[in-house]
């Protein structure tokens, strides 16, 4: 069941390589990445948000390798 759901998505391959030569010579990739985020072509998936004081819990969750997105650490301004 789950395999058929995964294969039903339409995937598009995009190669992105902002190495030092390319990035300094051509800054179009910055605008292109911004456009991808605005249009929803690329999505940032957030799994959980932790307070910085709960860093041990966040790292132990990351160590389980069950995260389905990014782990965000809220940091206070000192």
Swiss-Prot record:
It holds the Pfam family ADH_zinc_N_2. It comes from the Eukaryota. Partially overlaps AST1. This is Putative uncharacterized protein YBL068W-A.
């Amino acid at each position: 069941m789950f395999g058929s759901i995964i294969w039903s998505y339409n995937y598009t391959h995009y190669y992105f390589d902002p190495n030092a030569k390319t990035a300094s010579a051509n800054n179009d990739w910055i605008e292109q990445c911004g456009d991808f985020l605005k249009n929803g072509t690329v999505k940032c998936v957030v799994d959980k948000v932790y307070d910085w004081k709960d860093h041990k819990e966040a790292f132990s969750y990351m160590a389980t390798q069950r995260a389905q997105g990014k782990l965000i650490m809220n940091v206070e301004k000192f």
